[in-house]
């Protein structure tokens, strides 16, 4: 496997904010879509890209709630989007294409994490359906607009959580039982990276580049509402008063810091001729020196992450295999 995971030495750090990486970058005239761009990291991403001049369409299950959250941000609107509902995804893509706009940046940001087993109407495990398959269908639906941009980027917000599981090729939907929500999350985050790898291989000649990234650990996003404050404290992510611990060097970030790598992937000229890579802390992350998934027990103590991507998440053959599986599952 050719190792494309070579850090660039960008000059940015884990403490850099979205405003830092966008300084001096003018996104005027650029059209962007951000899924769940009205909450958590998505909201910070929308705010930062808009401040740089971009026009943003936010995909949200409740456009009214999204509009309230987005009040005061310029050049932004919300379309209804439910990533577990194929008809909703199709309608979103059709509405965007009907607008006649090109699409310069697609940020596949929405995600869910852990919890009990939930299935969509097709019987698919909800995290794989939402975090990967929904975005896969959406991206393919928006392909004409991406091509029309004459140079576009598809940014998939993955996670260090991809270290928790490779793709469960024989049972991606846990039909055999023994469900583990964090394994399901890890699988979906690995899928995000593999999707970026194969998308870039397929579409780079059309000027469409793919990126995946780990934003960092951000407690305030409400990504996992099933976790209690005690769980967060055990993982070392909140202090004794319940306040988030902010320590970028240990991957504990503010929302503004967490949105920085998304903004970097969406806009940095340093990535102009690079794609199909996994980013972390506003740079290309190195390959991890180990190959087996990490076992994490929330109750075992402070969560420790590393700077790097698992080899199985950037394997080109696996990426092609996942694309074929995804086409089958979304047909």
Where does each model-flagged region fall?
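N-terminal Rossmann-like NAD(P) cofactor-binding module of classical short-chain dehydrogenase/reductase
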Residues: 33, 104-107, 128, 155
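Short alpha-helical oligomerization interface
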Residues: 116-130, 177-179
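NAD(P)H-dependent oxidoreductase Rossmann-fold/reductase module
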Residues: 1-80, 86, 90-91, 95, ...
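Glycine-rich, N-terminal phosphate-binding loop of Rossmann-like dinucleotide-binding domains
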Residues: 36, 110, 131
